[in-house]
Amino acid sequence: MAAAQGPVAPSSLEQNGAVPSEATKKDQNLKRGNWGNQIEFVLTSVGYAVGLGNVWRFPYLCYRNGGGAFMFPYFIMLIFCGIPLFFMELSFGQFASQGCLGVWRISPMFKGVGYGMMVVSTYIGIYYNVVICIAFYYFFSSMTPVLPWTYCNNPWNTPDCMSVLDNPNITNGSQPPALPGNVSQALNQTLKRTSPSEEYWRLYVLKLSDDIGNFGEVRLPLLGCLGVSWVVVFLCLIRGVKSSGKVVYFTATFPYVVLTILFIRGVTLEGAFTGIMYYLTPQWDKILEAKVWGDAASQIFYSLGCAWGGLVTMASYNKFHNNCYRDSVIISITNCATSVYAGFVIFSILGFMANHLGVDVSRVADHGPGLAFVAYPEALTLLPISPLWSLLFFFMLILLGLGTQFCLLETLVTAIVDEVGNEWILQKKTYVTLGVAVAGFLLGIPLTSQAGIYWLLLMDNYAASFSLVIISCIMCVSIMYIYGHQNYFQDIQMMLGFPPPLFFQICWRFVSPAIIFFILIFSVIQYQPITYNQYQYPSWRVRIGFLMALSSVICIPLYALFQFCRTDGDTLLHRLKNATKPSRDWGPALLEHRTRRYAPTTTPSPEDGLEVQPLHPDKAQIPMVGSNGSSRFQDSRI
């Protein structure tokens, strides 16, 4: 009996990941656990938001859309859409202390939004770890005196290969001389010229097939690196946020050390200033183009990780009164500042490369895998001690990818554990994590085949594109207009001690949904069939891409119909009201925080536990404070 009455039961210790010597009294929620401290949450969220796209997509978008002029619409979209949506998702998860499924006790009919988030996180988690595994492969390949993509004398090279370092008198540790005019002219005019880095990527690493349907063989080196990547992710999450919260002290901060080292090295190179000017020189006429604003809005939306479910999940492990408003501003600004900073790192090196080749910067600028695994590695071969710079660059990519991957996996695991919710699965959370990791590894195997890059880009372009916009829009509408904006504002005031600022109230109700709708319309208008270099995807593969996108969105109406059919009511309208109003257990997870309108009307029994208590037994009545200070109840959310 004494053990049962102690402050912490053994099952709680095992579930929340605390080691025996770690004082769990710091955790408010003994059932789920909390972050060790607030720095862990901030670093984890920074690692989640700051990913590969900050390095390989934003600098190219900025250069293509007017240079420094692109910063204006970019930061406008950050202020009016990015930060408000970030704050909404953090406050949503923190208030309920639930993952992306459990939070929809707020309006059970919209629980399909949570399932849609899970589907999106599954897709992203599968292909994102394949990108990390390729970075691992390049990292291991850089542990040589001479980078394997430096010269054209390898078995996989073709007669079209041309390298500025093919001269045998040039060693890897010497400063490359200026290019002769005839070589520069040849590089400009020879259409067949391929670089050693491009052939290494296409003919050796990928052994790229000629069609998306021709899978060929599984590339065993990539498969091994994929296994390494998933093992690392699993080990870092073996105790949930208790273990990942310690890892992020390194994974979320060291990339900035590497960026700074690469920046200092880059700006000291000849031609770096030219590259930076290409990146920053404003073309103010571009601001009048709708495409620039659309790209800015899309980049803000996708780079912050909105509607993936990760923000809700990470915030659910916060203590109830944590200032998530402050955190959302800090993390969002850090994410965008990192994107701008990475642009200096990328374009300083590309400017140096363009200067060496005697070509325009636009000829070497690229984005996506082409930048990370072809253009930038080729530029690194021009530097003295190039393997060192290559090791640093790919180690940075690995850490950036892992920071996002941690949250993607934890999103799925938390959703499963919260949904099942019994004591057995709480004690076996580590096995759930292992099961999800193994499933992710198996599903990623086709992406390591010779046609894998085609499928990876297909998933990247469709699985997490306009579906995220739809999910985010429905989330905004359901919280602000179905649950009720006044209800939600009062929830935040109860949690933080102050209501959301007026600016955020306006953004949540009007501005942000309008911007999200604009992004959706822009995505439809600007849609172009996916291509990879000169390869045109067959129409049937594009249809598969659309099916992947719809698979997450379709969860919303299907679950709404399911919930509507299983809800009691005398009339259709009555059933609709019952299906959309909050569940009885909606609200703060801990009894000590269920005050005022969330206070239980009956004394909870020991079997019910102390974490989650029911609301009023008849209906989830939420009192609203009128203008005269009196209290009134709002039953309907419609």
Curated annotation (Swiss-Prot):
InterPro entries: Na/ntran_symport (IPR000175), Na/ntran_symport_glycine_GLY1 (IPR003028), SNS_sf (IPR037272). Residues 133-219 are extracellular. Residues 627-638 are annotated as: Essential for interaction with EXOC1. The modification Phosphothreonine is found at T603. It catalyses: glycine(out) + chloride(out) + 2 Na(+)(out) = glycine(in) + chloride(in) + 2 Na(+)(in). GO terms for cellular component: plasma membrane. It is a multi-pass membrane protein. The chain crosses the membrane at residues 41-61, 69-88, 112-132, 220-238, 247-264, 300-317, 329-350, 383-402, 431-449, 465-485, 506-525, 544-562. PROSITE patterns: NA_NEUROTRAN_SYMP_1, NA_NEUROTRAN_SYMP_2, NA_NEUROTRAN_SYMP_3. Glycans are attached at N169, N172, N182, N188. Residues 1-29, 597-638 are annotated as: Disordered. Belongs to the sodium:neurotransmitter symporter (SNF) (TC 2.A.22) family. SLC6A9 subfamily. Interacts with EXOC1; interaction increases the transporter capacity of SLC6A9 probably by promoting its insertion into the cell membrane. Interacts with EXOC3 and EXOC4. Sodium- and chloride-dependent glycine transporter which is essential for regulating glycine concentrations at inhibitory glycinergic synapses. This is Sodium- and chloride-dependent glycine transporter 1. It comes from Bos taurus (Bovine).
